[in-house]
Amino acid sequence: MRKQSKIIFYAGIVLGFAAVLTGVALSGGRKIPKDFTVSYDGIKTADITAGVSVHDPSVIEVDGTYYIFGSHMSGASSEDLRNWTSIGDGYTQSNPIFDDLLGTEHVFDYTGSRDSVIPTDDGTYHVWAPDVVYNRAQDLYYMYFCTSSTWNASNLCYAVSDKPEGPYTWKGALIYSGFAKDTIEATDVLDYVDISYAKKNYIIAGNKYNYEKYPNAIDPTVFYDADGKMWMVYGSWSGGIFLLEIDEKTGLVIHPKEDEKNGVDPYFGKRLLDGGHKSIEGPYILYDEESGYYYLFVSYGSLTREGGYQMRVFRSKTVDGEYVDMNGAYPGMWDDNAAYGLKLSGNYYLPGLNKAYMATGHNSAFVDEDGKKYIVYHTRFDNGQEYHEPRVHQYFLNQDGWPCMLPYATDGETIAESGYDISEVAGTYYVINQGTAISARIAQPVKLVLMENGNVYGENLEGIWSMEQGTCYMTITYGEKEYNGVFCQMKDEAGTDVMTFSAVGANESVWGVKYFE
């Protein structure tokens, strides 16, 4: 991305020169703060509500209306990305999102119900993690989703509608997983590989599915690449995240030729990340024209409130990888994946909230018609329950092209692209760094003071910060790490105006919130 000339506010670096360049008199004379006690006195708190509960929300915008679709046959619409109205929910034949999915023949033949070849582990219906995409060639909306019975036995399917809200009519199955010798005949696997290949690769000793190497066929996302080709990324735990091309004219998958050297399987496609049955799921790929990168979002941890659920992101210049993190690395099959991927959000508390957000994850993302970029995810709360709601945050790319997610749910904020006055951004911030751990720990704010002379002070730490001339870009360095991001004025979730920053470095995200005096 294009670099801007840097105006440096670092302590001890020719501050008079910086003042001439900016036309701002840098004080540098303020006393060094000594009290770093975190207090929320005088800060209004509130709960916002989306009005709906949609798990694993996948977003699509059509003519100014935003639609999200989630697990358990749920969906909602919104005009402002904040207030949502349900358009369907639950396993009923009358659910308007589908054209009688529960009564359609063959939908649950293999998985997803108590009567399937592989019955559901709890005897109920399982319809999970849909994704809706507009098929340009057919002028139709395609929903890709899964029916699932166990932690590795699943079936990717698709349905079609002429309207984004549905109803969607089931058209067929695409990919099967979790099969063994006695159930493979109920799949289409042998249409693409012979039985000897299947036994050698997919089925291991004890007549079990080779789940550590091959995927669980759930969590699909379908997208267009820079050249107009359609692709589907999918997978959860098990053998990791896989990629298959989609035939735009039919909506069906294109099975590739085997290429073992490059991780391409003739049935499941190309492995992009992970394997070894580690926590990674909910893949979502978005191509960004501004940076020229494909961004692969995934979630780590367990989706329960205290499961450490969190959002990560990798990127690549090509659609089929390699997808790498800020360190230029990616997790292999047997690596501890906590160290890999830029962590965008996990468990955190910020001022203005009545309760902490927990298990933020399984996100989608999009670039709106006005160029604003958004991340859509579900969150649980620090309230002892598993209730969840969708949230939408605006994000920006820093000067290195990495996503920086704003701290609070979007409320129509617009960043000052020409930057802010130093008096607006200097001051006392509530700062959280969620690190890279996968745990139930809730990140709590610490107090950092950004001085006008470029120094940073906190409890037992010192650092420096800087701004970029005529832009919103900023850098903060403390604890021997550098974080690059943006300043943005917005509202906290109680409606109070705040200055915020969001910056990333070393696969960590740092958020800061300053209240105006």
Residue ranges and their predicted role:
Residues 25-517:
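Carbohydrate-active catalytic/glycan-binding domains of CAZyme proteins
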Residues 1-15:
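N-terminal Sec-pathway targeting helices
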Residues 16-27:
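Hydrophobic alpha-helical membrane-insertion segments, chiefly the h-region
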